[in-house]
Design a protein with these regions (language model features):
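Short acidic-hydrophobic catalytic motif
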Residues: 1-178, 191-219
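Short, well-ordered surface patches within globular domains
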Residues: 182-188, 192
Length: 219
């Protein structure tokens, strides 16, 4: 597995799902997944949600430093421009992600009535490995999002909205079946992009944007 992730998950008792298990799960949602694919969700990821955010952050940080050492680390906006990595802090993330209690997939950002799940509850309900389809990241800048899909058109979400605004937008039928990114998904997505394209993700100090990761809320 990438950077030993599969082995670490196996050590926790989380065996990677078989191809037939993933295919069966996707068949059960075939109509919805076909619609989402037409709407631009074409990247498949098998996310090791059962790993801790701290472990995933370290794996991603180590991978960034390795790429930098090998002169294979480039900017998000331009794959020809070398990226100036802060090797002392390769992953710039709020420390609360590793220390605070997280509510996953909250229905609303309300401290007493968020309707979210703990990590253990998510694993119990849907497993420690999450098979997901994601759209191109980052999302378009404000005012330039396209409408994709013929049978069920979907307007791409655009940058420069608040977390509450995005959460409200996801209630619209055109965004059926969609959820915000979790930190675990973001880290694995960023790691995958790094290994495949040698590029960083969401470089907010450059030409990228901060990712809100709506799938995680701190009540």
């Amino acid at each position: 597995g990438s950077c030993g992730i599969t082995e670490q998950m196996r050590a926790k008792g989380y065996e990677i799902p078989s191809y037939s298990q993933i295919r069966s799960a996707f068949r059960a949602e075939q109509e919805l997944l076909t619609t989402k694919a037409e709407q631009g969700f074409k990247t498949f990821l098998l996310v090791p949600f059962g790993m801790s955010i701290a472990d995933l952050t370290k794996i991603y940080g180590d991978a960034l430093k390795k790429h930098k050492t090998e002169n294979k680390l480039f900017a998000e906006a331009d794959p020809a421009v070398p990226y100036d990595l802060n090797v002392e802090k390769p992953v710039d993330a709020w420390t609360g992600y590793q220390t605070e209690e997280i509510s996953y997939f909250s229905k609303q950002f309300d401290q007493t009535n968020h309707g979210g799940l703990t990590k253990a509850q998510v694993i119990q309900e849907s497993g420690a490995w999450q098979a997901v389809l994601i759209e191109d990241i980052p999302i378009p800048r404000a005012g330039v999002g396209a409408t994709l899909g013929t049978k069920k058109p979907r307007k791409q979400l655009e940058a420069k909205k608040s977390p509450n605004a995005y959460l409200e937008l996801l209630k619209d039928p055109q965004y059926e079946g969609e959820e915000g990114l979790t930190p675990e998904l973001w880290l694995y997505k960023a790691l995958t992009r790094l290994e495949e394209q040698n590029q960083v993700t969401d470089d907010w100090q450059g030409k990228g944007s901060i990712s809100y990761n709506l799938g995680a809320y701190f009540p």
